[in-house]
From Swiss-Prot:
Residues 30-127 are periplasmic. The chain crosses the membrane at residues 9-29. The gene is mzrA. It comes from Rahnella sp. (strain Y9602). This is Modulator protein MzrA. It is a single-pass membrane protein.
Length: 127
């Protein structure tokens, strides 16, 4: 009987630790940034004006591409789209409709990479 009591006394703390670990892992995974489907349009050289956001919206909408938003950001336009497949389609459409002199590339928001940089900074404090 003494052995049974001893075994039971180890089970509950172990279960609580496993539950706490599972909760922490679940919270950490839920806080990971979601992959974005955004494109950035910027001039290839200085002095080239950005295309009008409404023009870009109209042309992409005519081709059946659903746009979440078009935002100017640091001398560029950021086009937020629904899915990665629409991002690829929008990239080819934009290359067709925009004149030469624009760079169209995948855009990842700053907050998505900021947590990695923050972890690196925190790691430096531990040693």
């Amino acid at each position: 009987m003494n052995r049974r009591l001893l075994k039971r006394s180890f089970i509950w703390p172990l279960l609580l630790m496993l539950l706490a670990a599972a909760t922490m892992i679940g919270l950490a995974v839920s806080r990971l940034p979601a992959p974005t489907s955004a494109l950035q349009i910027r001039p290839a050289r200085a002095g080239v004006a950005l295309p009008d956001g409404f023009y870009v919206y109209q042309r992409l909408s005519q081709r059946g591409i659903h746009i979440k938003s078009i935002t100017p950001l640091n001398d560029a336009l950021v086009v937020q789209l629904d899915t990665a497949s629409q991002r690829k389609l929008a990239e080819t459409v934009l290359q067709d409709i925009l004149p030469a002199g624009f760079v169209i590339q995948y855009y990842e928001p700053q907050h998505a990479t900021a947590w990695g940089a923050k972890l690196d900074r925190e790691r430096l404090k531990f040693g």
